[in-house]
Amino acid sequence: MTLDLDALDRALDALPNLFRGPGGVAGVVKDGQVVASRAWGYADLTRRRPMETGTRLPICSISKQFTCGVLLDTLGDTAAYDARVAEFLPQFEGPLPTLRQLCDNQSGLRDYWALTVLQGAEATQTFRREDALPLIARMKTGHFPPGTAYSYCNCNFRIVSEILESETGRALPDLYAERIFGPAGMRTAELTSDTRHPADEVVGYEGSDAVGFFPADNGIFWIGDAGISASLQDMLAYESWIDATRDDENSIYRRISVPPAYVCGTPASYGFGLSHETVAGLKVTGHGGALRGFRAQRFHAADERLSVVVIFNHEASAHAAASSLLAAALGHEAPKGAGPEGWAGQWLDPESGLLLRVGEDAEGLTLRFATGPDRLTVGEDGVPRGAGVSLAREGATLVMNRTSDNLTVRAEPLPVVAVADAGEIAGRYHARELEADLVIEARDGGAYAGFEGLLGAGPMERLHPVGPDVWIVTTRRSMDAPAPGDWTLQVRREGGAVAGLRLGCWLARRIDYARV
């Protein structure tokens, strides 16, 4: 396979304008050699410190594959340690996930960063290392039986890291350095778990080109699920090491990139901290990363011996940027879709309790269901398709097939309600699942929800009606990024009176609250 290096250069030149923000880095490795390396903008606008290829940036959730790689390289067979998972979930009432299911995001557990919102956290408050395990230990149920579906969950990897450190008797930073950073030549990479103290004093920025940029104030401690800081030079060395060890079936990357599957045998799209997807017509493994003020993405196409890395110190889409580099280098053009017609609307999934919303534009559809919106194009057969998702209609029912999640949803139409009286649902509610409360206040047509729990009393969030007895709670900023976004809140009635609520988002579904 030959790369169009001129087209790649043009695509790299376009990144600062297409993905506007304070700064960023991007690089490409082909056949084990660095063929492109760029750094633009500033690591700190106020101090005028330029962004450089040696500037260390948080790679955030890209760290998950490093955790899984060290796990396999030190402990080997994960099944030998499955019994230890129970130590971290003492109140769990269903089948417990295995260690492998944690690594593959098939545990069915709710994401603990999403749950920090429901436990009363404010986006910028300090979240210490010792705050995580008590929150996880409160879990009593999950989304689904382990191994049957996919759900992104950061606490999976926090549990993995705790078991890994306990079994080896060694700190995770030392294991990273010994097993991956050293062999890969990642000379400056390190675990920087405390986000209040970023490596090289790099500043991440919230905001946008429309409203301006302001420094993100992060206060979380994460380990196992994220926390590594690395420069572009470090990350390109990692990609070169992957290529150099490609023929060794016992190499770390070969082992973590084996095709994953669900317990039923159906192929899965995520395993050992790696996403398996198709980008620009290529099968790739990789991962994204996010913290307020930062975005990162890496892709590796093993058959083509091609890798791409993009990291921003702002919140533009690193996934889209990295995808554009692959497309340019390969001369790939995405197929044009037919004009959509009659797909717009909203539906409610009775199983997850989540709202599905579909919007139309000239180029396709935007589906809002999971953490971020999915873009779909309508094929010649009239079927809207996107990355790992497609839509169909059975009468008024909307059928969503999320093959990457091993999930089929049959959602019923939800009539639109623009104005509703929140006075009926105002009051205090308690969730046994979380051992936490939800307070709703209504005044002069406005409605707001506040969460109280293990981490305090959080800010009041906006509450908007969307359908009969269905509301959305809007969370645009949280400890982790991206924020949960819109939570679907359903009213539960007994004899016509409000008895409780069911709240959920893609990362934390089906949480029941009883009226106090």
Swiss-Prot record:
Its EC number is 3.4.11.19. Residues 476-486 are annotated as: Important for specificity. One of its GO terms (biological process) is proteolysis. Substrate binds at residue 480. The active site is at residues 61, 64. It comes from the Bacteria. It is an enzyme of class 3 (hydrolase). Keywords: Aminopeptidase, Hydrolase, Protease. It catalyses: Release of an N-terminal D-amino acid from a peptide, Xaa-|-Yaa-, in which Xaa is preferably D-Ala, D-Ser or D-Thr. D-amino acid amides and methyl esters also are hydrolyzed, as is glycine amide. GO terms for molecular function: aminopeptidase activity. Inhibited by beta-lactam compounds such as 6-aminopenicillic acid, 7-aminocephalosporanic acid, benzylpenicillin and ampicillin. Inhibited by p-chloromercuribenzoate. Homodimer. Hydrolyzes N-terminal residues in D-amino acid-containing peptides. Belongs to the peptidase S12 family. This is D-aminopeptidase. It comes from Cereibacter sphaeroides (strain ATCC 17029 / ATH 2.4.9).
